[in-house]
Amino acid sequence: MGRDIVKNLKFKKHAGKHFDPEKFAQLLDESYRNTKRADGEMTKKSFSPSTLGYGHGTCPRYWYMAFSGAMFIDDNDAVAVANMAQGTQAHERLQKLISTMPEWKAEEEEIVNEYPPIRGFIDLIMEYDAETVIGEIKTAKQEVWDQRQAEMKPTTNHLLQLLTYMKLKNAKEGFFLYENKNTQELIVIPVSMNEKNKAIIEEAFTWMCEVWDNFKEGDLPMRPAGASKSKMPCTYCPIKKECYAGLTGTVQIESYKVPKL
């Protein structure tokens, strides 16, 4: 069941004759959900750096079916849609500010790789001392932001996204700009393409090549061992319904093992 976007209507009845807050809340919820991408058949042509390393992005079967063409269903409720919209607005606001800096070179730059096929958009490209530096903007609720500040580390899936861009742009340095959704405070987390991070991203590329090669060979992977609709990596998978209604598969490929930072 989706979360209510308006929270205060269960405990107090409105006595007015004209304005109906419950109807208003329902329409607001519907308006948010109507901004989602419509459900439908879709064929992915490449890996998405923002999906790799979390949930269904670690599943070989998901990528095989996505590359083959599948019915994508967006189950996000109004609260999730609102959170994504807030994140988009924060990106645009911060990109506009950073674009005034002399070191700024580009924003939302498309990047494409042939093998393994990858397509993404880089939030920020800066230049310091003639060296390219890649920046990624993220927003986080209070408890997540507190953890990022305490550890001065990104989440693993965020790191994989940045390292992908750094590898493809041959950048030695990058950074995250995390904004607190509650207070708009910022933390900057620098990232270097050191030996540990090189190993992490090379392993990810090796896995993507294996998954892509298998897709080209036409062998449907089986679901990960112990998988169920209510457990990761299946929980929020947009093609879960078609996956579980489909064939068992003919080959077992290991899910991507998310590294520990």
Language-model features: where?
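Metal-dependent nuclease catalytic cores that hydrolyze phosphodiester bonds in DNA/RNA
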Residues: 1-134, 140-147, 261
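Short, small-residue-rich loop/turn micro-motifs
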Residues: 138-139, 180
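Short, conserved glycine- and acidic-residue-centered signature motifs
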Residues: 154-158
